[in-house]
């Protein structure tokens, strides 16, 4: 796995503008207006509804080059915003792949977050974008999320059966339901008893 360091901060307005002009074939004046709407202080802001999709399309050529590198190394490339994962059933050189990806990222004004560059072997549990991939290639809920759900349940347990709930109680219960749903999106039958008790 390779994370891109301060990805949104380095997603500048120029690639956004070029996306509108070159890919969507808008006129330069329309591209300028759209770029002004989507960027803030010269970059794509973190947390806006448009940010993820715009960053992907503005840097589509960069991600295409990374994809080509993955193919050459015999890897499958998956991407979630700035989290890049390279997986293969066959051994490959993570050092060589990292160097080639580093060159491409730097060409586009980005660079890897080196402390977050990790290599996992076939027998390792691999944390990838909010899930764990087990050595048997199945998905598992991360321990951190399981602990969060358990702790949240301990907080709401005293007032689950109350006839009425405060606004704060309702928020806590709804938050717990959302966390359980996130876990069940990874492992379908996870937390059946807690789910039954809070429904």
Describe the role of every protein-language-model region.
Residues 1-5, 47, 51, 72-89:
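Catalytic palm active-site di-aspartate
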Residues 2-29, 33-48, 57-64, 92-199:
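Right-hand nucleic-acid polymerase module
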Residues 21-25, 71, 85:
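Hydrophobic/aromatic-lined pockets within catalytic cores
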Residues 69-74, 107-111:
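Short secondary-structure junctions
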